[in-house]
A protein has these predicted regions:
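A membrane-periplasm/extracellular boundary helix in multi-pass inner-membrane enzymes
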Residues: 158, 165-167, 264-312, 331-332
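N-terminal membrane topogenic signal
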Residues: 18-38
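Long extracytoplasmic/lumenal interhelical loops at the membrane interface
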Residues: 304, 309-328, 334-384
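Juxtamembrane membrane-water interface segments that cap and precede transmembrane helices
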Residues: 44-51, 185-201, 321-322, 362-383
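N-terminal hydrophobic segments of proteins, predominantly signal-anchor/transmembrane helices
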Residues: 34-51, 65-130
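Membrane-interfacial entry segments at the cytosolic side of transmembrane helices
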Residues: 140-149, 230-236, 273-287
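Membrane-embedded alpha-helical segments of multi-pass membrane proteins
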Residues: 56-75, 117-127, 208-216, 257-264
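Alpha-helical transmembrane segments of multi-pass inner-membrane proteins
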Residues: 146-179, 190-195, 199-250, 255-270
């Protein structure tokens, strides 16, 4: 697929380093099949994964996977080729169902949760299939889709700036609009997850790092050997997005994610066999660590964690016990280490592991009742 991308620039080579213009875009559309619009829409909506306009899924509401699926269906002949090339990936839903059968027989099946688990895997395959069809099989020019991707992320950053202004300038009608637009809003004071933070168009502020370092950064690395201008544009987008998010105090995770990404970049970009580069790399690593420490001091939540441990921040501690419950559930039924509890049955793992997780947290000097209370709360919510 990477080799295909090198050759996929025959149509829109004109003025590709200049600003995006309507003429190259229209030329691109006229030289491609009509169904390419579904691909372009899916790419444009990649930064939009937390609005009420998307399809509901646990912890996010994406739009792009459905559009990628439509593009795949429009190109079903090529989809068969893509499925053969990436057969192991396309067998994931089948493997998931087969492995889930023992858990379903033992613990029952939660139909809605199982459906969302399996459709989540189908969304992954739709995304993989659409990208393979477009850039590996059809080999469409990649510059126009990349322009759209960069523009859409700049737009989402602009939305975050407007959200931040609406919060700090107390523009309640605007803040209220965004609060209603987002499926789980972090905008105003009524948020049960902690308001007063811009979330751009993401499901949570903590998703910022996932987009920057899970989508844009790999693309930047791919572009380095193909087009330095686009690599630079992606780099500038990542840097501005990360710094802007930190300055606007959008979340704690972006501080940690940025430091980790910086450390990785320093390690990759230095030749550690060369003495001069080794000295420079060590200095850069020390500088990155200092930036991380400054980030901890500047962020109240990170400072609280550093001072009081895991329980210093409620959100951070919740991630610990909410993860520990199902992990301990594997210990309650060791055979589930091989098969799991079945797709959609993570709640059964939570119930089975809550007591053990509570004891473990108590032994570590933390509040073990939180792990038990989480499982009890879910039981009450489901009416058990």
């Amino acid at each position: 697929m990477n080799q295909a991308c090198v050759h996929n620039d025959t149509i829109d080579v004109g003025n590709h380093h200049g600003r995006p213009q309507c003429r190259p875009f229209l030329q691109f559309l006229t030289t491609q099949e009509r169904n390419v619009i579904w691909l372009l829409l899916a790419i444009a909506f990649l930064p939009v994964d937390g609005t009420t306009l998307g399809l509901y899924a646990p912890f996010w509401s994406p739009i792009s996977p459905a559009l990628f699926a439509v593009y795949c269906l429009c190109n079903w002949r090529q989809l068969r080729i893509a499925a053969n090339r990436y057969l192991l990936m396309f067998l994931l839903p089948v493997a998931c169902i087969i492995l889930s059968i023992p858990g379903w027989l033992k613990f029952g099946i939660h139909l809605n949760a199982a459906f969302m688990s399996i459709t989540g895997l189908l969304g992954v395959l739709a995304t993989l299939g659409a990208i393979a069809i477009a850039f590996d099989i059809k080999r469409i020019p990649w510059r126009t889709p990349l322009r759209i991707l960069i523009a859409s992320y700049w737009f989402s950053f602009g939305v975050g700036v407007v959200q931040w202004l609406s919060i700090h300038l107390h523009i309640k009608p605007l803040a209220g609009y965004f609060a209603h637009l987002m499926y789980r809003q972090y905008i105003n004071e009524s948020s049960v997850w902690g308001g007063g933070r811009p979330q751009f168009l993401f499901a949570e502020p903590s998703y910022i790092g996932m987009h920057l370092f899970g989508v844009l950064l790999p693309l930047m690395w791919l572009m380095r050997g193909r087009d330095r201008i686009y690599a630079k544009r992606l780099r500038n987008l990542i840097v501005v997005y990360a710094i802007g998010s930190v300055l606007m105090q959008a979340g704690t995770r972006i501080v940690l994610d940025s430091v980790v990404a910086l450390l990785v970049a320093i390690i990759v970009h230095n030749s550690w066999c060369d003495k001069k580069q080794r000295v420079r790399g060590i200095a850069q690593l020390l500088g990155a660590v200092m930036l991380g420490l400054l980030g901890v001091l500047a962020d109240s939540r990170l400072s609280s964690i550093a001072e009081n441990g895991a329980e210093g921040d409620g959100s951070f501690f919740a991630r610990i016990y909410q993860s520990l419950d199902p992990i301990c559930g594997l210990l309650a039924h060791p055979w589930t280490v091989l098969t799991g509890y079945g797709a959609g049955n993570i709640i059964n793992a939570v119930w089975a592991g809550a007591q053990h997780a509570g004891r473990l947290l108590n032994d570590l000097g933390m509040n073990g009742s939180a792990a038990v209370g989480f499982a009890v709360g879910i039981s009450n919510h489901l009416g058990r």
